[in-house]
Amino acid sequence: MTNFKWIVAAAGLLFGQVLAAPTATSTHAKRATVSDAAFGYASLNGGTTGGAGGTTTTVSSYAAFTSAVSGDDAKVVYVDGTIKQTADQVKIGSNTSIIGKDANAILEGFGVLVKEKENVIIRNLGVSKVLADNGDAIGVQYSNNVWIDHCDVSSDRDHDKDYYDGLIDITHGSDYVTVSNTFIHDHWKASLVGHSDSNEDEDSGHLTVTYANNYWYNVNSRAPSFRFGTGHVYNSYYLDVSDGINTRDGAQLLVESNQFVDSKKALYSTDDGYAVSNDNDFGDSENTAEEGTLTSMPYDYTLLGSANVKAAVVGTAGQTLTF
């Protein structure tokens, strides 16, 4: 079994003011720095440092944002306030940190795409209501070493399931990705790892993704849906999530220390997907996934215990940092 030495609290990545209501807004935001260390899969392969040590820019307009995040030189881009624009995803360069200064830092109507890049950090950023024609809220394709942390991604469920696309989709053989401390909510098809049943040649042996300390709320499906790769889902709270964790097409998942409330299918397989379940509270649902073989991870981490997840995650996941 994994040696659980990594301490979430010491890394400054999880704990803060805790609220019980279904919201991700903390009364007291936690101060963070651009040098905070990535964890999970994003800590491997040399680690993920983003733009630390590079140039620093603060933006508050669409034009300034698109310009600031381009190119592969090391850079830290702070988003100050809400930027509204109906547009396709903005492509992010390698060695980039995109940081929301506070809970008001939101991209509305357009998302971001990390494609054929490496070493990217997206933290404390809100992304909302990106139409399907304009892509995902956050997309990762053909890329490695990406850390998505303390973000708030959402749309609404007032439209049909195809009005918006994914909130966080990780595809085309991407590796060493961590999604952590993020509020994922009010959406039909939330988070996809592996985009197609026919993409085995590209995805097999890749798609190594950690989901940790996340709050999933009012989601219909894909929390996440995982094809072909290797995934770790732990310390997360699920409320009103119909179809939760779906392992499929040979994926191997380790699912630990999660709590599900009002879920129809908490953990399940399709097309020969596999999972190992450890200390999960499935509520009125159950684990129907085929038994897998993934019992340890190549990094250190600490499990909160399913009974403690709600208190630790709700009110802390999401845009609860300040910079």
Curated annotation (Swiss-Prot):
GO terms for molecular function: metal ion binding; pectate lyase activity. It is an enzyme of class 4 (lyase). It is found in: Secreted. GO terms for cellular component: extracellular region. It catalyses: Eliminative cleavage of (1->4)-alpha-D-galacturonan to give oligosaccharides with 4-deoxy-alpha-D-galact-4-enuronosyl groups at their non-reducing ends. Keywords: Calcium, Carbohydrate metabolism, Cell wall biogenesis/degradation, Glycoprotein, Lyase, Metal-binding, Polysaccharide degradation, Secreted, Signal. The keyword RNA-binding does not apply. Gene3D superfamilies: Single-stranded right-handed beta-helix, Pectin lyase-like (2.160.20.10). It comes from the Eukaryota. Binds 1 Ca(2+) ion per subunit. Its cofactor is Ca(2+). Pfam families: Pectate_lyase_4 (PF00544). InterPro entries: Pec_lyase, Pectin_lyas_fold, Pectin_lyase_fold/virulence, PEL. GO terms for biological process: cell wall organization; pectin catabolic process. Its EC number is 4.2.2.2. Residues 1-31 form the signal peptide. Ca(2+) binds at residues 136, 165, 169. The active site is at residue 222. The keyword Cytoplasm does not apply. Glycans are attached at residue 95. Belongs to the polysaccharide lyase 1 family. Pectinolytic enzyme consist of four classes of enzymes: pectin lyase, polygalacturonase, pectin methylesterase and rhamnogalacturonase. Among pectinolytic enzymes, pectin lyase is the most important in depolymerization of pectin, since it cleaves internal glycosidic bonds of highly methylated pectins. Favors pectate, the anion, over pectin, the methyl ester. This is Pectate lyase A. It comes from Aspergillus niger. The gene is plyA.
